[in-house]
C-alpha cells in the first residue's frame, strides 16, 4: 500500500506502548523500500524515553533506517492510556527521563539528530480530562520554544466530528499570531459503529447520530467524512491559505485502502475545491486500484 500513496505524503508513524523497540525503524525501512517520495514522521513518546542517551540512540537508528535524510518528527507526551497522538496535557506520571514533551524538546537532541521540523499535538476538545484551554496553554509553550530555537513547527490535531469546534480552534490559534502549519485531524471513512468506538477510546465527542429514517449510506463509510470536509472547504475558502490549514491528518480507522479511495474521490470533488486535494500527485499504480 505505500506505493499507492500520493507523492509527498507525510506518513506519521505512531509510538504505541505495546510496540517492540525497533518498530519505527522497521516501518522506516519498509517505506524506504516500497514508497516513493513519501515523508516519514516518526513519533517520539517523551515520557517513555528512559534517558537522553536512549533518545539519541533511537534518533540515530531512525536516521540509519532512512539513509540519514530524516528531517521531521512528532513529539507526544506518550501516556500509556492515551491515543497515539494524544497526551501533551494528559495526566499520569513520567516513566522515564522526561515529564512532558517540552522537557524533551528543551534538550535540543532533535536538532542535533538532524531534525528540522517538529510536529506537535493539537487537541480542540482537550485531552484525558484536561480542558481545551489547558491543552492550548501547553501547545503555546512548545510553539514559543520552537520560535526561540528557530525550529520549524507544525501542529497535527486530534480528529473531531464537530467542524465548528475544530475550525474555531484553528481560528483561535491564528488569532494568537501563530503561523505554523496545521494538519487538521480527519477520521477517514468507517462505519458509524467504528467511529463511535474510536471517539470513545480517544475521548472526543462522538459523531452525530443519523436520523431514524436516514438511508443506509448515512450510517456507513459512504457518508463520512464528506459533510466534515465540505464544511472545511467552505471555511478554508473564507480564510485563505495562510489563516487556514495546510493539510489533512487522516486517521484511516476503516482501513488504509478505503481512506485512499475516499481521498482520491475527494481530490476530484468540486465541493472540496480549495483544499488542495486536486494537486495531489497520485502514482501510476493507483490507477485502476483505488
Question: For each predicted feature, which ranges?
Answer:
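A structural motif corresponding to the C-terminal end of an alpha-helix
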Residues: 34-37, 107-116, 145-153, 231-247
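Active-site glycine-rich loop that binds ribose-phosphate moieties when present
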Residues: 131-147
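Structured C-terminal cap/extension of enzyme domains
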Residues: 174, 226, 230-290
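Conserved, mostly hydrophobic/aromatic
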Residues: 42, 142, 151, 184, ...
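Flexible glycine/acidic-rich beta-alpha junction loops that bind and position SAM and/or redox cofactors
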Residues: 81-88, 128, 186-202, 257
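Catalytic-face loop-and-helix region of soluble metabolic enzyme cores
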Residues: 180-243
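Short catalytic-loop micro-motif centered on adjacent basic/acidic residues
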Residues: 12-13, 42-44, 154-159, 247-250
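Active-site beta->alpha loop and helix N-cap motifs at the rims of alpha/beta catalytic domains
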Residues: 1-136
Amino acid at each position: 500500500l505505500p506505493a499507492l500513496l500520493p507523492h509527498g505524503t507525510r506518513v506519521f508513524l505512531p509510538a504505541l506502548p505495546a510496540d517492540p523497540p525497533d518498530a519505527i525503524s522497521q516501518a522506516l525501512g519498509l517505506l524506504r523500500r516500497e514508497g516513493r517520495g513519501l515523508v516519514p514522521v516518526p513519533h517520539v513518546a517523551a515520557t517513555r524515553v528512559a534517558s537522553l542517551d536512549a533518545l539519541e540512540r533511537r534518533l540515530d537508528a531512525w536516521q540509519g533506517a532512512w539513509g540519514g535524510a530524516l528531517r521531521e518528527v512528532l513529539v507526544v507526551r506518550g501516556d500509556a492510556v492515551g491515543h497515539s497522538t494524544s497526551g501533551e496535557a494528559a495526566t499520569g506520571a513520567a516513566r522515564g527521563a522526561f515529564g512532558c514533551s517540552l522537557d524533551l524538546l528543551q534538550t535540543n537532541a532533535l536538532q542535533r539528530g538532524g531534525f528540522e521540523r517538529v510536529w506537535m499535538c493539537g487537541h480542540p476538545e482537550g485531552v484525558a480530562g484536561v480542558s481545551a484551554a489547558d491543552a492550548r496553554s501547553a501547545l503555546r509553550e512548545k510553539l514559543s520554544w520552537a520560535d526561540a530555537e528557530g525550529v520549524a513547527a507544525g501542529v497535527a490535531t486530534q480528529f473531531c466530528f464537530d467542524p465548528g469546534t475544530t475550525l474555531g480552534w484553528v481560528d483561535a490559534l491564528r488569532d494568537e499570531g501563530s503561523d505554523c502549519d496545521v494538519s487538521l485531524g480527519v477520521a477517514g471513512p468507517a462505519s458509524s459503529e467504528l467511529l463511535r468506538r474510536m471517539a470513545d477510546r480517544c475521548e472526543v465527542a462522538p459523531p452525530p447520530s443519523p436520523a431514524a429514517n436516514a438511508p443506509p449510506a448515512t450510517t456507513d463509510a459512504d457518508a463520512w467524512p464528506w459533510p466534515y470536509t465540505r464544511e472545511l472547504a467552505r471555511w478554508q475558502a473564507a480564510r485563505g491559505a495562510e489563516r487556514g490549514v495546510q493539510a489533512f491528518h487522516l486517521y484511516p480507522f476503516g482501513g488504509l485502502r478505503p481512506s485512499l479511495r475516499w481521498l482520491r474521490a475527494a481530490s476530484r470533488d468540486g465541493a472540496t475545491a480549495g483544499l488542495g486535494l486536486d494537486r495531489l500527485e497520485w502514482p501510476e499504480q493507483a490507477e485502476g486500484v483505488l
